[in-house]
Every structure is written in structure tokens, then in C-alpha cells.
Amino acid sequence: VWKGELKNLKKNGDYYWVKAIIEPNFSKEGKIVGYSAIRYDITDRKLIEILSITDGLTNIYNRRYFDEIFPKIINNAKRKNELVSFLFMDIDHFKLYNDNYGHQMGDEVIIKFATCLKESLNRSSDFAFRLGGEEFAIVYQCDTKEKAIEFANTIKSNIEDLKITHEFNSASPYITASMGLICKNANDIDDKIYKQADDLLYEAKRSGRNQIKVNE
């Protein structure tokens, strides 16, 4: 017997979700001669679930989902003895941007920034989050710390390549971000990882912004 949830596509292009129970049908001789399926439409419930873990402005994952999924990612990586990379970032001088360009323009920056992060991810095991305000994070896995740093630098470049003018940014004429990167074997990660990444982020800010500080 197989039980699970399936995402399907309607002819009109809309998606719908079903919960399915599939079990084999046997002949008198005990051979499988077919399958029977029971399906329940759970689209409304799935939409509510998705809304509860999605940031309303940017449509990327929110802080609630970060708090839920991050420990699971770490525990899964521990079983496989893998590295986990946590890239914590903050848009440089965002308050100055809001004060001078207006909150509507500020919201547009937040949306473009989030879209850039999401489009920079390559694998289903990589996650982008808006943690609140102008704070974002990416959780991803790389084979080596060097590759993790390389990917973080790609993210930083992609953000500046958006070419969103920010006359009040001391680091660049455009929107940029300061970042703190923690890349460790999952078995060496403890509950201080968020604070450690936050400390690195603010070290990046103190050092001139638009840069990445990495754990030793």
C-alpha cells in the first residue's frame, strides 16, 4: 500500500493537490493484476500550508519555515556527515533607502532582492528565506568550503548586478548586501550558528559593507 500527496496539473494550467492511497489487487493465485486508488482533494489545505510558510511580500519562505526546516536540514546532513552552509545577509543602508526613496520603492527592492536569491539557487535542497525586514538567508550544501564561498560570492555579485540605484549606499552606487557565512560539517554545528552568522554579518558591515565574512 502506498500513501502520499501528489501535485497535479489541470488542463487550464492550474495546480491541484490530492492525497492518494494506492493498493494492489491480487488474483486468486496471489499475483498482482492491477491497482486501486482512492484520492482526496486537499488543494485548500495545501494552499493554507503554503501561505503559512511563505513571506507575503516576496513569496519566498518566511522565518517560521526557517525555524522549522533548518534543524531538519542539519540533522539530515549529520546522518550523511555533510557540510551545511548558512548565508545570512542584510541589505546595506536599507533604512536610508526607505527614507529617501519611499517605502513603496523599498518594497520593490525587497521583492527584487528575494527574486534574485531564489533564481540563484540550483537545487531543491537549497532554500531562500526572508527572515524579517531587510534580513535574508540562504541554506545550501556544497562539497567543500571553497565552493560554498564561491557560491556566496556569486550571490553577492548577482545582487549588485541588479543595478538598483542607491545614492546613499557608502559601499556602491547600487543596492548591495553584507553577509555572514557559516560553513561547517553538520556534526560541528550547534544552536549558536545563527548568532555566529549574525556576528560575521555585522563584522562585514563594520569593515565597509558589500562583503562576506566567513567562519574560520
Model-predicted regions and their roles:
Residues 28, 103, 145-153, 169, ...:
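Catalytic-core segments of nucleotide cyclases and related cyclic-nucleotide turnover enzymes
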Residues 50, 63-83, 114-122, 141:
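Short regulatory alpha-helical coupling segments
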Residues 105-125, 135, 154:
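Active-site-proximal alpha-helical element of nucleotidyl cyclase-like catalytic domains
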